[in-house]
């Protein structure tokens, strides 16, 4: 088998993944995959023209995955992260999402997320590097 970089836009990997995953869904559930189950989001906060906070992720089926949440150090402690988490929960409820998932490293914001109702469901030590661990967290919407 030959491995090579993608140089053509005829079939991008996303198209391939979608085709294969749709086939798996339809085989498992014995029905067509509904439209609108996958979407991405990017939310940001600005102070004038300055970007001071951002959050992005994906929604697949009934789960939201927060990929990144960052607050400019000059703006930390002003509840911007809390506003994003509250907004994500409200938005998730509106569109029928039942759980919000995220990961955070040992030197990041585990306690912040616990304060906002997230639970740790997994932990890997020395990931992504020695001396650092990653927490896997979930918030179940009621």
Model-derived segments and spans:
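Acetyl-CoA-dependent GNAT
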Residues: 4-67, 72
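Conserved acetyl-CoA-binding loop-helix of GNAT-fold acetyltransferases
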Residues: 77-90, 115
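Short glycine/proline-centered loop/turn elements that form peptide/ligand docking sites
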Residues: 81, 85, 106-109, 126-132
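Conserved GNAT acetyl-CoA-binding A-motif
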Residues: 92-105
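Conserved catalytic-core motifs of GNAT/GCN5-like acyltransferases
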Residues: 101-103, 119-136
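Short beta-strand-to-coil "C-cap" segments at the C-terminal boundary of structured domains/repeats
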Residues: 138-142
